[in-house]
């Protein structure tokens, strides 16, 4: 019972901290920039423990590079036609992968690429963008301080430049970079060409399914599709049953659920709450749910298909057998 109480305390403590950080950013930068708080929060939580596989002092350069992309990339991609945005996404996501994801087991892509997609999906202009830049710069400084404090004794000898010098298409790690970059960018391109809203949803779905090891992708794709449907059904029931005054708290309920979820499946279920609570207000419940289910099912299937196709193309061009484990 004592361990359960401690666990519950930790979950709620983290939740309170997360809500406080996002609220502070929203108050200072405006509600349109609450996503900045989410992006910085995710980075802080990761950089407390994760590293980049290079010297700590050079890791600070990676953080600066990552935040430079988060500041410029999403805004630029929203200013140009779909094909130009596709090229910008290719460059930005690839750089995020190279600078932030060398240590594959840290799963840093689920933080930095996710932040990029969120900032792109919740775009702002004018004074709001100026405030966004200020917020991200402050977040960068906070992340650098926390990262250096926690990681300064790491024994790595690899440098920031080595992340680029060591790039090799025959490396399984670098092929994963290419796969994820192409799959996410091309999926969003199709959404933009079809003039469908929430292109970031399919980008996030593809990113989540495109794991470093191909053998893991099929299982992840099935869970992504199936448990998004479960999440949408639960959300729909809550949205219909609860009074409108409770709608703003559905996302928070999802956050608590994620905190209690030990596995990917139920994390996927509860992650739908926050996304749909916003989309349902914009598009209506029916369209938002159908869009969410369709985008995630198609995105998961598309990622699985592209992963196998890219491996076959690589094997045919190089004569090398692709390792799946």
Q: Model regions: which residues?
A:
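Alpha-helical transmembrane segments and their membrane-interface boundaries
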Residues: 1-110, 114-233, 237-253, 257-270, ...
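Short glycine/proline-centered loop/turn elements that form peptide/ligand docking sites
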Residues: 274
């Amino acid at each position: 019972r004592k361990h359960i109480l401690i666990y519950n305390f930790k979950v709620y403590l983290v939740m309170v901290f997360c809500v406080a950080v996002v609220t502070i950013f929203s108050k200072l930068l405006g509600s349109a920039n609450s996503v900045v708080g989410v992006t910085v929060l995710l980075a802080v939580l990761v950089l407390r423990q994760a590293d980049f596989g290079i010297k700590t002092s050079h890791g600070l350069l990676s953080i600066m590079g990552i935040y430079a992309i988060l500041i410029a990339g999403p805004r630029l991609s929203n200013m140009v036609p779909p094909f130009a945005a596709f090229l910008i996404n290719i460059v930005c996501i690839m750089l995020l992968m190279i600078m932030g994801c060398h240590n594959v087991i840290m799963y840093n892509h689920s933080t930095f690429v996710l932040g990029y997609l969120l900032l792109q999906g919740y775009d702002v202009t004018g004074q709001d963008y100026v405030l966004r830049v200020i917020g991200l710069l402050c977040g960068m400084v906070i992340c650098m301080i926390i990262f250096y404090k926690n990681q300064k004794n790491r024994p790595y000898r690899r440098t920031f430049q080595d992340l680029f010098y060591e790039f090799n298409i025959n490396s399984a790690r670098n092929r994963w970079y290419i796969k994820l970059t192409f799959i996410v960018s091309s999926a969003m391109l199709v959404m933009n060409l079809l003039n469908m809203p929430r292109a970031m949803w399919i980008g996030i779905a593809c990113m989540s399914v495109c794991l470093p090891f191909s053998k893991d992708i099929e299982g992840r794709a099935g869970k992504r599709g199936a448990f998004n449907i479960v999440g949408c059904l639960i959300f729909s029931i809550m949205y219909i049953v609860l009074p409108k005054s409770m709608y703003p708290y559905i996302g928070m309920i999802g956050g608590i659920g994620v905190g209690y979820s030990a596995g990917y499946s139920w994390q996927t279920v509860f992650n739908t709450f926050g996304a749909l609570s916003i989309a349902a207000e914009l598009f209506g419940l029916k369209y938002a749910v159908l869009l969410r289910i369709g985008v995630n099912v198609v995105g998961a299937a598309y990622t699985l298909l592209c992963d196998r196709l890219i491996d076959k193309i690589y094997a045919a061009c190089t004569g090398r057998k692709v390792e799946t484990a």
